Each structure stands twice: as C-alpha cells, then as structure tokens.
C-alpha cells in the first residue's frame, strides 16, 4: 500500500509495479471480504473493536506518519471515529438501560472529537494533515483519548 501511495502522491506516476501492487491489493481485499462473512462477531468483540479503532488513532495516526505521501490522515481519523461511533450507536439503547450517564459521556466526547475534525473539513473531504496545527493535533489526541476512556467501559452491557 505504501508503494502505491508513494507512486500516486509523490512520484505522480502509475507504472507496471504500481499496477501489480494495485492488483494484489484488490485480490487481498476480495479475500478479506469473502472471509468476513464467516467470522463470528460477538457484542464483546465489537465493543473491543470500537476501543481499538480509537487506540489506533491516538497511537499511530496522530503522528502523521501513516499517510506520509498523501497526507490524508484526517480521512482515516474520521473513518475510525465513525466506526467506533457506529458500534456505540448499535449498543446505545442497551447502554442507556444500564448506565445513562456513561452513554451521555460517550456522546459528549464523540461530539467533541467530531467538532475538532470539522474544523479541517474542506468541501466533502478534509484538508491535508500538514494544515493541522500542533496545538490541534494535541487537542485531537487528547479528545480521542478522553473518548476512549468511557467507551472502554461500555462492556458493562455484556455483564
């Protein structure tokens, strides 16, 4: 994937190697898609997945090193946040029965993260990650970490 990104965003060319890498990436994606139907996804696994999505943002994506050529890191942030938020939304009715305050805290933290991301919206997408100030990178990391803490407690619904 890195070679494809470099070819597209740094070298500005698509050569035989890029095409070969793209074909392999497509093949791998199709295999993954076929295997996904056979997985048994439990509520506990989904809840852990939501926390893992946030951890990925706060530990690796926030540095800007993942999308070093395309600088599309904010798209990845948003995708991870949306994934975690979808899982929260699915379990929110059950969580509200067990712990309304926790549910409200989670929603408040999602709103904060999304508001920070919205600062960098550009039409239907996002500005390059280089446009994000160091202060906002820290604020975003702090907001994601603040969201992860209550989100990790959502497993209360499986007890």
Protein language model regions, located:
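Mature extracytoplasmic or organellar-lumen-exposed domains after removal of signal/transit peptides
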Residues: 1-159
